[in-house]
Amino acid sequence: MGEPGQSWSRRGLLVGGAVAGAGLVLPGRAFAGPPPTADPAPPATGPVPGPSAVPGPDGMPGPAGAGPLAEGVPVPYIARCFEWGARKPKFPPRIWDRRPIRILVHHTAGANTNDYSVGAAHRMARAIQNYHMDRNGWLDSGQHFTISRGGHVMEGRLWSLGELNGGRRVVEGAHSPGQNVIAIGIENEGTYTGVDPTPALWNSLRVTCAYICLRYGIAPTELYGHRDYRNTLCPGDRLYAALPRLRREVAGLLGRRLSRTESTKASWPLLRTGDRGPMVEAAQYLLRDAGSLTGKPDGRFDDRTAAAVSEFQRAHRADDVNGLLGGETWPELARTVRAGTEDDAARAVEVLAAARRVESVPDVVDHPQWQKLLGTSGSAVPDAQDPQGVLNR
């Protein structure tokens, strides 16, 4: 959710606001009835605390607890808000009378603690809530669910668990602008830019995702990283790279089988200061094409390039400007290029084609073709966005 050095940060590090362009906006209405007056009681068939009965990929059980089964799928033990000592929200969360269509995976960008206790997990959940409410001004925790490095799973925003168990409605979150109703947000404690999640966290993540998919009818292919939709490092390079594996393992828990091709999604590369190579050079040509960069592209993502990205983001009304070239800015920057044109956008195509030794390029280079040239092709990442009226707080 945040970035290194900002334990619980969201806004100020991520690019907020609605995604520019002609993205699909899904219909849906806010739940019109009064919300519950108290944290709803767990269902009679709900899970009970205890060690997990579901072995992880390494054969070891995770600590989140998953004894009961629902339609053959393990039910994780998820601590409700009152169990980890949550504050009362500033005002009741909104509940939408619709199901989410995907899951977004985040990391907290906090410390990779070695304290795997339930007490440490609860302290972390409270710290996130305090930051979101006191620094960001949100009504409650932004994410729907939180998983600690010890594998303990907790409800994030109030009523998220009750609505998940019901399987028909969703609590409006604040974990990613444009994805706060149509996507369930899961925070994973730690920073995963250079290390992998703990086995306990990983096991709880896959079990929790499988249960969410079951209750809401979400396909296991519809698991994404925060960076797929925003200009952010989240959920870290290592955790993001593990998403194809996560999709396959979640599918397995649901009794399905996904091939490596089916579990791979087309993405936009995340470019940042210090990167080098043809992708950076192509991006520089596109930035010059857009009027945001002057001078000769040299394939180095330096301060000049970061400033150009920031200028482009400002021009496209990003709420936050951070100089990271990721899933929000690429679709705006990589415009359609047609054969026969001789401009900087066409030169960007030539740079990538030469780097990948592509002998022929289609007459029209659109987003899927750009992603092939960038080497990140796969099944498309859908651009569906939240319905109108989402508060993003």
Segments predicted by a language model, with ranges:
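Short, solvent-exposed linear patches
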Residues: H367-Q371
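Active-site acidic/histidine clusters and adjacent loop/turn architecture
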Residues: R98-G137
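C-terminal extensions
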Residues: A339-V358, L391-R393
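Surface-exposed patches in mature extracellular/periplasmic domains of secreted proteins
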Residues: R135-H144, R215-R227, G295-P297, V321, ...
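Extracellular-facing binding/remodeling surfaces
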Residues: Y285-D298, H316-D319, V351-V364, A380
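Basic/polar, cationic surfaces and motifs that engage anionic cell-wall
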Residues: G2-W8, A18, L26, G33-D97, ...
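Second-shell loop/turn segments in exported
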Residues: G110-G119, G190-P199, S267-G274, T294-P297, ...
